[in-house]
Amino acid sequence: MSDLDSSSSSAYPKYLEHLSGDGKAIGVLTSGGDAQGMNAAVRAVVRMGIYTGAKVYFIYEGYQGLVDGGSNIVEAKWDCVSSILQVGGTIIGSARCKAFRSREGRLKAACNLARLGITNLCVIGGDGSLTGANLFRKEWSGLLEELARNGDIDNDTVQKYSYLNVVGMVGSIDNDFCGTDMTIGTDSALHRIIEVVDAIMTTAQSHQRTFVLEVMGRHCGYLALVSALTCGADWVFLPESPPEEDWEENMCLKLSENRARKKRLNIIIVSEGAIDMQNKPITSEKIKELVVKNLGFDTRVTILGHVQRGGTPSAFDRILASRMGVEAVIALLEATPETPACVVSLRGNQAVRLPLMECVQMTQDVQKAMDERRFKEAVKLRGRRFEGNLNTYKRLAIKLPDEKIVKSNCNVAVINVGAPAAGMNAAVRSAVRVGIADGHKMFAIYDGFEGFANGQIKEIGWADVGGWTGQGGSILGTKRTLPGKYLEKIAEQMHSHSINALLIIGGFEAYLGLLELAAAREKHEAFCVPMVMVPATVSNNVPGSDFSIGADTALNTITDTCDRIKQSASGTKRRVFIIETMGGYCGYLANMGALAAGADAAYIFEEPFDIGDLQSNVVHLTEKMKTSIQRGLVLRNESCSVNYTTDFIYQLYSEEGKGVFDCRKNVLGHMQQGGAPSPFDRNFGTKISAKAMEWISAKLKGSQGTGKKFVSDDSICVLGICKRDLLFQPVAELKKVTDFEHRIPKEQWWLKLRPIMKILAKYEASYDMSDSGKLESLQHHEEL
């Protein structure tokens, strides 16, 4: 396939020169607690390092291996990291090391590295591991001079390896490191928690039980908070935000109110480091005793423990770790003696580099604030995302009494449009509850625009959407029908129900529908109200947003299926599988699925390919069969080519590979739209929908009873995530950046990740580094 030169933000794209790491050596180690996705990071560092011409060394058993040296430091080969993407934990081991804390231990470590010429260190671990690496870097020249004085190394070695470069990647399920949106392993840990919560819900409902779930996280409440948000928990206990003094009474009142509303189960989530206002621990057993004593509810405690560290990494963690690994190698190759140690981090969908010690300092400041009971400051220091999650949870979990809600006298309708996508129901629940909290009357429209025209609309209450977060598909019902032929009837329904604003949750059809409603404003006054669309489609093809609700769940389905298929191919030997994914003309699922599953190739519409490309892929796979990895995996987007169909590619591979490998095909189909939503989709759907309702409330404020008509472009928008921010973009502006024929945006951010997929599959590719991390200050990073 031809390499895609993605458009760059700078005037001149900056490409990674092949073999720019020639003569350099990189050591990679994992330290501290293990986390799912560490292996994906190790794989990316090894393969990107080898691709650039550098030597890469495994350092086994973390810092202990660094101190012990010998067989603990081994050169890594390309094939060493095959088949590890789907494995949890870390294949190179991790251990706590007292020896490295002493200068004597670090002296041994420096000697081991200098003798092998390793002057680039990639550390995957938590804040303690990264702090140790930075100290080692600072002491490096002094350590080498001492080794030379002791006669362990010669003076030439001191001169040649005079400085050590250090780059960190944060591998921790706790997500407790300041400066990064997500640490490697957090998303997978959330998958484990949500799997347990979903399983517990059925047994709790059968018996009308209360469950107290204790999750990990040490002194960081991220896992507990997001779990509570994604499963609609009744109560959550966090170290950063202890409950008020009379929390026992308030919690029992909330639980009994929910039970009185016919809710058959209560879920309380407790972070293992939960404390009260006096910094005294709140344990799951204490909560159970309280509920049993005060309410007499049948209550059970489940401590999830190390289950959260285990299992297969999620698609998100594999992609995150692969991107971070590639970025870490580039950062090491670009480093100079003056460059401070950095940590590669994620902000929105962008890889950034941040000064390591600034991040460590801020992480320690959070703990200090908690120790000194400055809890509001601790929440702020955790970052915008944590604070946003906490505020959203509070709004959705606790309903004020009706008499305390200030009525807006506005009616807001919610509608699902397009194909079903996992997470739609979480978005509807969030919209309904935020709308009610803002004093609006909320209306649900059933079966899309067709149902709207037929009057399938009714008021929906707070309790009506209870338990919707974990439900897949669309409970309201959704259709691809556009509003065009029903405009008169829809306008009548808007008028008769006095609808003052409309929230549309859906895919490309929802976007087209919004454009049709915008065009009909001149003719129909009923459409002169604020309208906003939240993207929800597995295809991730809505202009104005880098991600859409449902795409992450579909990606996990593809990744899980590919893992099983790869296992089948490994057992059979010399077999290549062709997998067809959904997405219409958008290659997001095929490309990102290939990156997450470790595929050999992905055919997508956005990057035209010809018979020559197909033949070169066959040659590549033929060469691969001569190695120890005797299997192949190729993904194909369903609409990537009119003539090069899945059947055609299957037949071509079968014929050309005759005698070397055999071939099988698999069309994944509608299984990609189904299943329970992933934690990411539940959380994203909840937050983006809440943000959309805040926008509607702000627009409606003060307009009721004034007869104000909303006719400006900025009153009909798409809300999407763009790079680092949630943005409202008028559909009138988005028209310019839309390829209507193929139903995709004209520019797509993920195409820049395409070379990563190729490089990790052993192809040569032009990797555009224009967006590669410039070292940012943490303060600037937090303000964005």
From Swiss-Prot:
Substrate binds at residues 172-174, 209, 216-218, 272, 300, 306-309. The modification Phosphoserine is found at residues 2, 6, 20, 141. It comes from the Eukaryota. Allosterically activated by ADP, AMP, or fructose 2,6-bisphosphate, and allosterically inhibited by ATP or citrate. Changing residue 145 to G: In strain: C57BL/6J. Residues 411-784 are annotated as: C-terminal regulatory PFK domain 2. The active site is at residue 174. Glycans are attached at residue 539. This is ATP-dependent 6-phosphofructokinase, platelet type. It comes from Mus musculus (Mouse).
